[in-house]
């Protein structure tokens, strides 16, 4: 199980990389991250930056 750190304006998240289901661009250079079995989280950064972070794992 590989955790990735995602930064948010309200705090930071540690997410299991394999549980990320989808990414959606949001306003103000933020991205929604869909997590299997949970509600989406809103993180800081463009969709490309978040995708690169997840793939680098």
Question: Model-derived features: where do they sit?
Answer:
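Acidic, Ser/Thr- and proline-rich intrinsically disordered linker/docking segments
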Residues: 1-57
């Amino acid at each position: 199980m590989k955790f990735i750190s995602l930064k948010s304006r309200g705090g930071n998240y540690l997410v299991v990389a394999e549980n990320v289901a989808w990414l959606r661009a949001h306003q103000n250079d933020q991205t929604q991250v869909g997590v299997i079995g949970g509600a989406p989280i809103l993180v800081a950064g463009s969709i490309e930056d978040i995708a690169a972070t997840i793939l680098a794992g």
